[in-house]
Amino acid sequence: MNSGLKWRKLGRVFCPTGETPWMQSHAAVPIAEHLHDDLFRIYFSSRDARNRSYTGSLIIDIADPTRVLDLSTTPVLAPGSLGEFDDSGAMATWLTEVGGRRHLYYIGWNLGVTVPFRNSIGLALASVDGSDRFVRYAPGPIVDRSMTEPHFCASCCVVPNGDVFSMWYLACTGWQLCNGRPEHKYHIRYAESVDGVVWSRSGEVAIDFANIEEYAISRPSVMRDADVWRMWYSHRGRSYRIGYAESADGRRWTRNDNKVGIEVSEHGWDSEMIEYPFVFDHKGRRYMLYNGNGYGRTGLGIAILEGLT
């Protein structure tokens, strides 16, 4: 186990400026997909004028990551039909390969009445033409509220792990009224699947609240190195920061937020908060995509791991 990480910010990659009706603002919850050579496709969640979430994509060269080479003109994934679990938004949260086909896990949004929203996890499969388009696996979610998780589930990370797939996912533990407004509380739990579709959940907590002020832990990003599992995630009491944890088996985690090695900037687009990390490797280097102020309203950025401190 190391004494600490050190990330160097490379800059902001992209921030929407109303390019299309479905991309009026936000570039939240980024995901990197390696295409070939140094080219990567970055998936992200944008919003339209009605505040509905869409999934879009762009392409960068990792050698010059703050220059966008291509930007999608149509959504990768759009909100579902009226009354479905994702009719208010379809926000990509993780991409992995299952049985030779790319599986895109996404957060489906429904607006609520007694509480502002309800989330669940949906699945879309890659189009057979190899493009960035995805088609829904089913009109309903694959992970939703249940008898033992009655509120909502959201952002997740899915990793092949021997004969199963491991999922770390956001689970809401409850809502309460604060000054007359409903406020949620959620942390990260663990689930397993043999096919990446049907998931077994036991309520096992992976990352729990550090103190009574903390109320939100989200967007896990897990890497398995030779000697340790590592997880990056968002956590907040007052405003979002990126956290870090280590594990010997991917199940029992030790939080080491003080070792994360990345903080808000003194000024600019990520000076108030940093959140929604996505960590990936390329040619022996480790990178992190992340969001800044406004939960993705100011765009997405990239950092590179420079080593241990």
Residue ranges and their predicted role:
Residues M91:
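Metal-dependent C-N hydrolase catalytic cores
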Residues M1-S25, V29, E33-S88, T96-H151, ...:
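Beta-rich carbohydrate-recognition and catalytic domains
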